[in-house]
Amino acid sequence: MNSFLMTCAMKAAKCLLVDGRLDYSSDEYWYRFGQDYDENKIDVFYCLSTTLLSSNDKDGNPSLFSNLSKEDISIMQDEYKYMSTEMFDSEHFNFIAPYYRQMTFEAYEQTDESAVIHALAPAITDICDAFDYYMENLNNGRPFIIAGFSQGGIMTQSLLVHMSDKQYKQVIAAYSIGYELTEDILKKDHIKAAEGEDDLGVIISYNSVASTDTMWDLIEGNCAVCINPLNWKTDDTPATLRYDGDEASVHVDKEKQVLIVEGLDPEKYDGLGYPIEKGIYHMWDPRFYVKEIKANAIHRAELFKNSINKV
């Protein structure tokens, strides 16, 4: 099965914008690009999650994608700052992150496929253009990681399909955090699900919930695979999560392919201000496993380096 959003994303990728493309040679379209760049560190190309509400167009209708106003860019800062300090810190990583005309929250309420494709086309166009600019002007043939959370997970999967076979050979791993990996997308080029902590060129995908009764069908209703970042198992072997003084047991539900987090208070771990049903730990998917993702990214990068040295 495929998800509605990913179906729209793949169709949007076939109708990238011709006019109105952004100039990624300009610093204004980057949170960070090449500042303090160190070839001894690991490149991470990061795609932001949904952070914005729609603004109205000139006719008073909600625009379903960002226009990258100063206000939009200001709102985007918090996630970039968190991810570039806590998960992909400057000690180990070169954090490369574009601003892009992301789909807004209101777009998720749309049931008309054409409207969602229209909303996703600028986002995917921008992410692909930003990635191409990075590859042509900074990467210099080096291995890299791509990562994204939520809508950024859609962008991560779209980038894997977009890139050339030569570029894919440089991929250490892809972290599609908080977005489903479906059976249909697994059939696409360059999409290979992680099976453990050591495999390379793979995509890591997981979604956390209190139970299968509290699932967000839009982003985790069609999961074909799931990996537990606490123990890097794809079976239902449990692992202990320790976060903010709390402790929980986390295992993969083999039927729904989501992470079941048992032992946390859903009232405490809510949607962080977003209208998300209690027991859906979507907003916590980066935070719960931040140390494990960081350590794993470093580990896989070292394995990739060793594999090159053996050739």
Q: Could you describe each region identified by the protein language model?
A:
Residues M1-M87:
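Flexible, membrane-associating and regulatory peripheral segments of lipid-active enzymes
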Residues G34-D38, S84-D89, K166, E195-E197, ...:
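A general structural signal for short secondary-structure junctions and capping/turn motifs
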Residues N40-I42, E91-F95, N140-P143, K169-A173:
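Loop/turn elements at helix/coil->beta-strand transitions in domains of secreted/extracellular proteins
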Residues V44, F95-A97, I203-S205:
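Conserved beta-strand scaffold positions in the cores of enzyme catalytic domains, especially
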Residues L48-R142, Y269-V311:
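Active-site catalytic motif of lipid deacylating hydrolases and related acyltransferases
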Residues D126-N140, V161-V311:
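Surface cap/lid and interfacial helix-loop subdomains adjacent to catalytic sites
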Residues G148-G152, T156:
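Gly/Ala-rich beta-loop-alpha elbow adjacent to hydrolase catalytic centers
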